[in-house]
Structures are given as C-alpha cells and as structure tokens.
Amino acid sequence: KVAPKLVVEDTPVVQTPVVPVASEKKTKDVKSVRFELAVYMLGNAMLIESVPEQTDLAHREFSQKLAVNILKAIHRQPGEPVTQLITWPLFEHPNAPKDQEAASSYLKGKLQGMKVDRDVELVIYSGRSAADFALGESLTPGEKIKRDGVDHLVTYSLGQLLNSPAMKADFWDQISAS
C-alpha cells in the first residue's frame, strides 16, 4: 500500500485577543459592616435592639429586663419572650461576605421569617441604628410606618429609656398611640 501524500498549505495564523477572566475584573471598594441585634418576641410583637459594642453586663441585663417588660405590658400575656441574638458578619473568614448589601439581604430574610412564624403585627425598633440595620431606613424616634400589614415603630434605644424618664414617658405615649 502506498501512504497518502501530505499537502501542506500556507495558511495565515489568526491571533485571538486575550480576554481577562472574571477574577481579574476590578472590584469596587466594599465597606464591611458589623452589628449585633437582640430580637425579643412575645405574642404578635417584636422588639429589635442594636446592642452597643462595649456594653457592660449590668447594662445588658437591665436592657433585657426593660425589653421583656415592654413586651409584657403591650400584650398583657403570661410567659417569657423568645430572645435571639443576630450578629453580622455571620462568621470570620476572608472570603465571607461582610458588606452592607449582603448584611441587609440576610437580615431582611431572617427577620421576615421570624415575623411570619410569629404572625407579628408590631415591630419596635429600639434606637435609630436598629432601624437602620433591620428596616433599611433612617427614621427618627417616634416615626411609624406600615409595611405588608405590619406596624413598624422607631423609638429611643433601651439605654436612653433606662437613663431618661422623659424619654420613657414619650415612648409610652408612642405605644399608646399605636
């Protein structure tokens, strides 16, 4: 048998442009966010407090007692509130999401699930920072909005209520008007 002849033609060499991979794209500077929220639930009410970073144990205990008393006074129901602490970021790792958008998405989903499970009708945000993180809006104490059939009331922080009888009286006026 005879082997076939190889014919070599002059073909032009085509160069394809180099396309950078996705990981080489420039990323915008993302500011990391840290917070700790205490969520107290009793009946169909929820109280969300932004826990200050450097809070001593006695202050934290007084804040918890005040939150419990507020919820009991609103609903006049026996029993103790369910309390949950939500921290962000979820865990420490260089690749873990820490930005405001991820925090907001996680927190909204988490709180929405808690509201649905308990059929919540009233959410009290204790302090502006609690409202900023949990509600995603910057409201001042005394402001109230309604979303999806749930009343959202922003009030003073528990620390402010503990230290100021005038703020505490104003808070009870806000609750009475709800």
Named regions from a protein language model:
Residues 1-178:
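A polyanion-binding, active-site-adjacent surface
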